[in-house]
């Protein structure tokens, strides 16, 4: 450990390394990221990065967890301020499909691409992938269960809905992240909300405000 390594509290130093790893993996991809690159950007030694994370695979999963913190913090705050299922699901879809809705790492969807690729071949990464995906499904399930309890919607298999809706949002978000010329953020938003409203039985239609904003009118 260098003198510079020792000058920063452990938790802060770990966060610095995770942010550096998340940024570099998002920029270059997992295969092109080296421990030395992460150490250099974080102002740490490669030995310290290895001390904290052991392997590059583990660094990837921890970097993704770090980048997801801002997403879930924003989601929890958003959900607490909305009173109905339609507004809550609209908020979750915007956080998922609209670019940079939170203070997340730029290009953070690239971390998920690399995680999925590594999970296909590495059991330890696969286990982490299951945990991360389940956290997302659990949030959707909670939104639906709360709506059922409040008599906003009829009783439904919330777990089944969450699995389907999460998979739909994953697919749409991939297209948006890849800048697909057919599936942009607005279309992804409309598709997701149309599905949710039909599956859960609440009224929904794109607002005039959104159409005006897309056409270049006032927001």
Residue spans for each PLM region:
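Short loop-to-helix capping motifs
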Residues: 55, 121-123
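Short, basic, alpha-helical segments at the C-terminal edge of helix-turn-helix-like DNA-binding modules
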Residues: 65-70
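N-terminal intrinsically disordered/low-complexity leader segments
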Residues: 1-12, 19, 204-219
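Amphipathic alpha-helical packing segments from all-alpha helical-bundle domains
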Residues: 105-113, 123-149, 190-194
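Short coil/turn segments at alpha/beta junctions that flank glycine-rich nucleotide-binding fingerprints
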Residues: 27-31, 81-82, 150
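Helix-turn-helix
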Residues: 16, 20-58, 62
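Hydrophobic alpha-helical connector segments
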Residues: 62, 76-109, 161-165, 211-212
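Hydrophobic/aromatic-rich alpha-helical bundle segments in the mid-to-C-terminal region
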Residues: 126-130, 148-214, 219
């Amino acid at each position: 450990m260098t003198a510079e390594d020792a000058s920063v509290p452990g938790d802060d130093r770990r966060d610095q390394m995770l942010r550096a790893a998340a940024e570099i993996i998002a920029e270059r991809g997992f295969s092109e990221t080296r421990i030395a690159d992460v150490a250099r950007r974080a102002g740490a030694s490669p030995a310290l990065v290895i001390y904290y994370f052991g392997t590059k695979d583990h660094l990837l999963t921890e970097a993704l967890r770090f980048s997801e913190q801002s997403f879930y913090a924003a989601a929890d705050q958003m959900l607490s301020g909305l009173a109905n299922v339609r507004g809550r699901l609209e908020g979750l879809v915007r956080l998922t499909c609209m670019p940079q809705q939170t203070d997340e790492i730029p290009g953070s969807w690239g971390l998920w691409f690399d995680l999925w690729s590594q999970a296909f071949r590495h059991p330890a990464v696969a286990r982490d992938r299951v945990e991360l995906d389940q956290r997302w499904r659990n949030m959707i399930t909670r939104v639906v269960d709360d709506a059922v309890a409040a008599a906003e919607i009829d009783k439904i298999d919330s777990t089944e809905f969450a699995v389907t809706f999460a998979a739909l949002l994953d697919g749409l978000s991939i297209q948006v992240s890849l800048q697909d010329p057919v599936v942009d953020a607005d279309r992804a938003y409309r598709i997701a909300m149309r599905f949710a409203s039909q599956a859960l039985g609440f009224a929904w239609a794109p607002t005039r405000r959104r159409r005006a904003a897309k056409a270049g009118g006032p927001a």
